[in-house]
Amino acid sequence: MDASGKGAAGFEGKLFVQTIDARDENEEKYMRAYRAFEETTAGLSDKDFHDLLSSLVSKEKQHEEISLALVYIILTDPSSAPKTYRDLTLLTRDGLGFVTANLAMLVAEKYHKLTDVGRKQLLWLLRELIKNQVLNVDNLAWNILRQASGGDISPKNVALIEGLLDIFTEHRAWLEKDQFLVGTVAYTFVRLIEDHFGPQFVHLRNREVKFVISLIRDRFMDIIPLGREFVRLLQNVGRIPEFDQLWKDMLYNPKSLCPTFNGVWQLLQTRTSRRFLRGRLTPDIERKIHFLTSNVKFGNQKRYQDWFQERYFNTPESQSLRCDLIRFIISAIHPTNDMLCSDIIPRWAIIGWLLTSCTNAVTLANAKLALFYDWLFFDPAKDNIMNVEPGILVMYHSIKNHPLVSCTLLDFLCRIMKNFYPKWEDRIRTGIYNSLRKILEMKVIPNLVPLFESPKLDRELKGMLRETFREFCVPPNSMYMHPGPPQPGMETPMMMHYPGPGGGEQVEQHPPHLMHPAAKAASTAASADDPKFSDDEDDATTKPATTTTTTTTTTKTEDVSDDDDLPLAKVRLLEKPAIAKVALPDTLNGHLEEFLREKSVKTFEPLLQCLGSCGKAALNQEQENYLTESVISVIKQTLPDKSYFPASKTDDNLSESINYPLFAAYRLLYQQEDSCKKRVMALLVAIVTRVSVAGYMLLYFLKVHGKLQGRRKETAGGSTAFKASVYGVLCDALDSVDSVDECIEKDLNLLEKHNTQMFLWILPDMYREFKQTMLNNTTVLRLLVGCIDANNLGDIIYSITQGKLILFDEDGIVEILRKSLEYETFEQVCIWQLVQAHDIPLETFQEIIPELESGAHAEALTAILLLLRAEKPTTELVRLLLSRETESKHRGDPFVTSVLRYWCQEFEEKLSELIAALLTSKYPSNSPNKRKRPSKSAQQNTAPTSEQLLNHLEHFRRSCRHGNGTGTGLFVQNDMQRALQQAFTHSSESQRKQFSDLFALAAEDETSTTVGRRGTSSRGRKAPSNKKETAAEKAAAAAAAAHANNSKKAAEASAKFSDDSSDEDWSKQKASKRRKTLSDSD
């Protein structure tokens, strides 16, 4: 090799583009390493070269510098790259761990400065690392994938995308081993396809579509965690035939994609990890955005924005990057309170700039959706206010100086509510209403009046706002406006624009692709009723009505000085004017007037009886509307507060708790059920639709009424029991797409938020009367474990033990346990307590053992460990245990080690036979146990590899080689000896080196051809001549001694461990608590 200074200087310009910027430490590190390498190896022959490097890499410092130098040569000299890579693999001491870590850092920080040759060679090196199964390459692949920027169709970016596509297509099997990487690749390429609609990209787009569709369909279980952001991306490519068919399957045949997939709404309810959003920005752009949001003062941002505009938005195609930036800013950048109080530029100002500077109608429509996307599915119990804050602040601060921005955003918000997903319009409406309620509750803005009642809004938009957000708008006059039929303009779907096959062509399409014609035809028309809210969801302070009216209201505002203690439904009524009176038949009008005056049960019952006896032609539509609105108004005013649920369940207390007008209507339904008059049923439907708490109050009434009737007749059964059919009749009458099961889940969810004690009181009856819905219901079970304390848990377990309550059975336990892995720690502890209370055998859910991760699922692992202590080792249990991945190179899997050591105290010989048979089955050649291998496909899917088996045995050996030798008797059994010998014979050189101490435990067999072959290796099987062999001899002697001891002594000895044991060091600092259902700001 040439060691001259000229040769070294020749390489200096080949890795990084030369700029006027001073080299940083990262660049200098590679330069120094290469120069030192050249000086050391100049003029050496190949033999001397390898001998010298082999001696140098034994030292940590030299090993790192030589590795960097070889990487430098690979990235700068394509002709010598294959030979240099071979040298690198021969000289590495850590399985190329140092190399992959430094390459990942290089890509993240310096990729934009790499030369074209360096970028090309980086892809070549990534391909070689994947081909040779090097560990931890996934992080490097993820960093390179981030560099494939959206909105960039430059030759360099397209070459990178094509290179990555080639690698992932060629090494598909490697890709599918990593669930997160599968999701990232699918998410990335669906986003990139959006930019490749130009005619010059036809071939590339076809390859991308073929690859990503295949990946999505084959690995849809890994796609589900991508959540709602993936749906947003899919809408932009929905016109491609392959994606159109995927949409049809997701909408109409979801089970064909994945047995556990229930449809698009399941994805929309799943929050997308911010890591996927972060992956769609290059590290360079991410650093610039972080600088803009944390260092630039408000008012000084223009020059930074101009620079950013010129650098990243300088082509028509680059405009699509705006949506990625908006989603990242909303979901990933959550400023602290100190920053919010400072003069740093706020997020809403940056988003406002991204919207106003957009020049492409397609991108602008998608950017609006990106801004409001979290609003559509907002759940105050789970979602973060920081995700909806920018949207309201952009409109609020723009209404004065930039009214056009606020008007277009308000118009978009009104239309997207009805047209985003017509089938679930009510859920979208609830999400947006929840967002506004949370905004007012957290006082993000004082109130909505300056925005919704601004004089700068045109008349049509104001009318649309009052119709869509009636609960938040101040009425224009004192007369209550009955919701009429939908206006033609309101029913016209807001059209989204998508790039057509020609790139610049704009194609109108309903947003998102959920608006497939067949899907829209199946959807129902928008309801004009008020949205559903529980009274305790929103406690924002509202201003008393100040509008002067000619009609007196039913409740006087001056009688209430402080409305904080009133239910929200009553507070709303303080702001609403009286209902315009309509003439009714005399008898019916008299009962209605009396009910409006008295607002009592005794006046409501005659009204219902009179209404039921009215003829078909007795009332017209206007009269029906007036009657319905009047009754609902009183029902809302007389809703019981939280205290109506009595602490003492005496007959008097229970009777008093259902002495409200709403329960009078339920009493009539209870008596008549299917024979209930049509007009009365229509009124009940309107009440349940407009009063969100009415659903669970029916459940409460059914329990109380049945209980009271049963006590009076001295029986708890028969016709006086909890009549579940009444609830079903009312659910069937609702003009809703929700099934009875979904109605139950919604009502129980509201009930749990409203009154936990009532929820727990009703729940046993729900499990008994709605067994088909409630049994194995993970949604309700999550509500249950999320609201109970230790006393409640004890009561539930008592009921289960007495046979009064069954929450789940063996058929649904696996799905329940899998979903519980995301619960909080106490919730998981409750789940496992309930599993034991139900006496569910371990064999029904043992299949989840390989899926559990030591660092993420400690609760489940400890519970299963305690259950395994009561089990005897079986072939299936041992197979599942040893199929677990070893997460730590040094510590191994403490769960597996603990189970094996415990079993060794009593079942050492049996355990040895099982493990030996499993290990032998991995090597079919000359295997005496070949016929014993399991044949079931389910077992083959989780069968451990030989590498996993040897890893677990090695860590087990380390854990028990000290002390009194407890557990080492596992290795002295004849079957295990033969298995280790056979494993040694079929192992590669690297495996023999890695597990040398383990193989050393196998005794010599003079007649065995296996040992003969081993004798020819460089290791030899002679008397121990080094420390390792001496340790092996001692371990074998200790094993023999331990095998002769009784189990009690073995148990005592099992507590002794050495410092380098694979068991956990309990004195070290505890790991941070695992985060589960946390908000994004955390």
Curated annotation (Swiss-Prot):
It comes from the Eukaryota. One of its GO terms (cellular component) is nucleus. Keywords: Cytoplasm, Nucleus. Transmembrane segments: none annotated. Its main location: nucleus. Residues 517-528, 542-555, 1008-1018, 1033-1056 have a biased composition (Low complexity). Residues 483-563, 923-945, 1005-1082 are annotated as: Disordered. It holds the Pfam family HEAT_Ints3_C. Residues 936-945 have a biased composition (Polar residues). It is found in: Nucleus; Cytoplasm. InterPro entries: HEAT_Ints3_C (IPR056518), INTS3 (IPR045334), INTS3_N (IPR019333). Belongs to the multiprotein complex Integrator. The core complex associates with protein phosphatase 2A subunits, to form the Integrator-PP2A (INTAC) complex. Belongs to the Integrator subunit 3 family. Component of the integrator complex, a multiprotein complex that terminates RNA polymerase II (Pol II) transcription in the promoter-proximal region of genes. The integrator complex provides a quality checkpoint during transcription elongation by driving premature transcription termination of transcripts that are unfavorably configured for transcriptional elongation: the complex terminates transcription by (1) catalyzing dephosphorylation of the C-terminal domain (CTD) of Pol II subunit Polr2A/Rbp1 and Spt5, and (2) degrading the exiting nascent RNA transcript via endonuclease activity. This is Integrator complex subunit 3 homolog. It comes from Anopheles gambiae (African malaria mosquito). The lineage of its organism: Eukaryota, Metazoa, Ecdysozoa, Arthropoda, Hexapoda.
